[in-house]
Amino acid sequence: MVKAEPARGEEPIKKRNVIVVGGGIAGISTAIFLLDDGHHVTLFETGQPDKGTSSGNAGVISVASCVPTATPRTIANVPSMLLNPHGPLMIRWRYLPKLMPWLSRLVLNAKPSRVQRNARRKAGLLAHASRNYDQILTITGLGGLTHQPGLLTVFETERGWRQAQWILKLLIDIGREVEILNSNEIGQVEHGLKPIFQHAFLTPDSGHILDPGKLMIGLHEAFLARGGVRISERILGITRSNPKSVSVTSSNGEYTAERLVITAGAWSKKLLETIGIKVPLEAER
């Protein structure tokens, strides 16, 4: 692992008691990195490591996935998506009043200037993805679970290819590596595809996890083996009575630590609301 050493004149990192709520890929990775820095870590997770969101997914490490959801094209397509019973967008109308603050921010962030800004910020975060996976897999001895052939995006029609030009320009403008492929080159990169695709672009710095479920089981086992504590209790709320500690209330009692990390996915919003913090977070599914 490449560890960040304190700069000259800075004090070493203080070792703390930390609670992590949520044991998905974000939570378990955070917990292991904290352990590696010498902190005492307690992880709260009620589900099995290889179930829930962490099961049945593609395991993609997509460094180039920095195009925001909020774009002018997304907003323009909302009416047709809602009217299509088989479309990718569905809204429970009874939930619409609660959803409006999030939707308002979505529309606001679809301005071209904000799309550029948000893409650059996402790119800055994702630039560390491959390196961080390499670090944590080295720490835990699970290095054989990654493969980096790049991410290939293919287009069957000229219309689809033309509509994607703004995405290509955005990726290039923010410094992502992109390779443009013609129909012959597509077949050389991916032999299993039928020769029906006319255009494609490849982002070579992307990869994927070969077995996401196996990875999650391995990370949880490594966390426990390295001295981490896992408690299978559901967290119901958060309290903070003083600046130096924070407590969480579970289905079985109260636990206190110096620091708290919330990585509970869509459930993070309700947990944070128990201490008056509101975040613009909604479930995608």
PLM region descriptions:
Residues 162-174, 196-259:
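Helical element adjacent to the flavin cofactor pocket in flavoenzyme catalytic cores
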Residues 1-18, 36-37:
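Extreme N-terminal leader/targeting segments of oxidoreductases
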Residues 58-183:
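Dinucleotide-binding Rossmann-like beta1-alpha1 core, especially the glycine-rich loop
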Residues 47-52, 250-285:
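Central helical "cap/lid" subdomain
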Residues 16-42:
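N-terminal Rossmann-like FAD-binding beta1-loop-alpha1 element of flavoenzymes
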Residues 39-40, 176, 228, 277:
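Short phosphate-binding/catalytic loops that engage adenosine nucleotides
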Residues 36-55:
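Glycine-rich FAD pyrophosphate-binding loop
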Residues 21, 63, 262-263:
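Redox-cofactor binding/interface segments in oxidoreductases and associated redox assembly factors
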